[in-house]
Amino acid sequence: MRISIFGLGYVGAVCAGCLSARGHDVVGVDISSTKIDLINNGKSPIVEPGLEELLQKGLATGKLRGTTDFAEAIRATDLSMICVGTPSKKNGDLELDYIESVCREIGYVLRDKNTRHTIVVRSTVLPGTVANVVIPILEDCSGKKAGVDFGVAVNPEFLRESTAIKDYDLPPMTVIGEFDKASGDVLQSLYEELDAPIIRKDIAVAEMIKYTCNVWHATKVTFANEIGNIAKAVGVDGREVMDVVCQDKALNLSQYYMRPGFAFGGSCLPKDVRALTYRAGSLDVDAPLLNSLMRSNTSQVQNAFDMVASYDTRKVALLGLSFKAGTDDLRESPLVELAEMLIGKGFDLSIFDSNVEYARVHGANKDYIESKIPHVSSLLNSDFDQVINDSDVIILGNRDERFRSLANKTPEGKRVIDLVGFMTNATTEDGRAEGICW
């Protein structure tokens, strides 16, 4: 494949070396003549183990060259990768000047280019950047239509400095965000030789995946550091603790808790978060990430309330009251908190939860229900159909399987708010179901 790479920093230089070494015809483009001279002399413009050897191989086989001539590079290739920097502004937003400049250069050349060209954004950009910045510039400068006259895609990179060559050759996954199917097909053919799953998504999803991965890595580092600081303060080696924590692949390092949805609750998590952060505070150990957990959890309950309040009705059904399906435990259930907020604001609330209904009459939680939340328990109704029929808005609160069908086939005249992820897609055909995080 004939590929031009714009920006020969850490991402662009590595891509140029790896792609040319795999037999692709690569033109590296940069405004810095110093970088171009280095590339053309087989020298790496960055410090990266193994890269110089790849660049030299590309030069020796005639598969790699560098230039400062943007137009010539675009005319000589079929696919352009944008790898320029997107540094932070003082306010934290991204500086997109380099992206915009490259897009203008590409667009002007495309105006007179008769063959199809695919533009791939590898630079890290926020969701909406390609749709609202990249494509409009390309279309305006070229006078052509994205997805028709030229292709557009996003291909986020997951390269770490000092291990970038290995990361390129052995990626955990290859993410392709495609504006048009043809562009996705082109990129898939480029990466099929790599032993990694190829995941094709919409462009905005791909943009968000990159940020989610990086923020998750930052969160893990911060979490481990805060746990380590607290552990040290109580006389424990935090490394020993985290080593054992990371051995649990069923829960600790798994997909189990990594699903967007409603707040956490129950008798353990809230209590233990409060206890550990209290101990940290008593030892003068700063743990801002851990201290934010309960506040963030409460915010998610508020989000659910706001969704209900956005509808012009007061008749609401809450399906599920315990913090998870299959239990009658109401201790610190976020659904109880949501119910109390709705009651306090005058909503006409009906609640269905077969486990809690049984517990109210027979279970060990009877005293808890009657003494702690009698105002909530009095709204429980064991007639599922009546609860549905008497409501205008239906909240799917836990993963009781009998609630699933309501998410994808909303009853006539009703609205559904899905807190648990029963909806198959982010939207339904009738548009009457809405997810809290989708």
Curated annotation (Swiss-Prot):
Record-annotated active site: C268
EC code: 1.1.1.132
Induction remarks: By oxidative compounds such as H(2)O(2).
Enzyme class: oxidoreductase
Highest taxon of source: Bacteria
InterPro entries reported in the protein's UniProt record: 6-PGluconate_DH-like_C_sf, GDPman_DH, NAD(P)-bd_dom_sf, UDP-Glc/GDP-Man, UDP-Glc/GDP-Man_DH_C, UDP-Glc/GDP-Man_DH_C_sf, UDP-Glc/GDP-Man_DH_dimer, UDP-Glc/GDP-Man_DH_N
Family listed: Belongs to the UDP-glucose/GDP-mannose dehydrogenase family.
Annotated metabolic or biological route of this protein: Glycan biosynthesis; alginate biosynthesis
Binding-site residues, GDP-alpha-D-mannuronate: E161, K210, N214, H217, N225, Y256, Y257, R259, F262, G265, K324
Pfam family, one: UDPG_MGDP_dh
Function noted in UniProt: Catalyzes the oxidation of guanosine diphospho-D-mannose (GDP-D-mannose) to GDP-D-mannuronic acid, a precursor for alginate polymerization. The alginate layer causes a mucoid phenotype and provides a protective barrier against host immune defenses and antibiotics.
Reaction(s) catalysed by this chain's protein: GDP-alpha-D-mannose + 2 NAD(+) + H2O = GDP-alpha-D-mannuronate + 2 NADH + 3 H(+)
Signal peptide coordinates: none
Record protein name field: GDP-mannose 6-dehydrogenase
Record keywords: Alginate biosynthesis, NAD, Oxidoreductase
Binding residue positions for NAD(+): Y10, V11, D30, K35, T86, T124, K271, R331
SUPFAM superfamilies named among the record's database cross-references: 6-phosphogluconate dehydrogenase C-terminal domain-like (SSF48179), NAD(P)-binding Rossmann-fold domains (SSF51735), UDP-glucose/GDP-mannose dehydrogenase C-terminal domain (SSF52413)
Alphabetized GO MF terms: GDP-mannose 6-dehydrogenase activity; NAD binding
GO terms, biological process: alginic acid biosynthetic process
Disulfide bridge partners, by residue number: none
